[in-house]
């Protein structure tokens, strides 16, 4: 239980400190943005933090070999769909990056209706992928989301 509680508070703090966005109480924070954007498209906040932790470990300057960028490791193709008219170099901006990533997750959920399929697609582009690396990714994200929410339904899915 202590581990769950520590995780609930640690992950948002890690993201905020890692991005330099930790701020005084009452002012707008990345945490507020994640909460607002998540609610707008019905994406669980815990899932967003779990994706951020898994994709970039909270490093807003992270860049993959495939040129995916920022906290949520969005691709240029995804960026151009969800952030129309905004320059690709803004993908390193934490606020813009999470806006894009959350919108993408919400759009994928509308298509698939399953967080497992959403994460499979988010990771490798194929909602039905059975690749071992994709299976590990999905399990890791769902486990982290479950640890943050304390909700066991995120963990130990039979279809994984």
Where are each of the predicted segments found?
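N-terminal signal peptide c-region/cleavage motif recognized by signal peptidases
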Residues: 17-19
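Catalytic glycan-binding domains that act on GlcNAc-containing polysaccharides
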Residues: 23-160
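Bacterial N-terminal signal peptides
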Residues: 7-15
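Short amphipathic alpha-helical "recognition" segments used for binding
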Residues: 6-7, 59
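Positively charged n-region of N-terminal signal peptides that target proteins for export
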Residues: 1-4
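Compositionally biased, intrinsically disordered low-complexity regions
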Residues: 7, 22-23
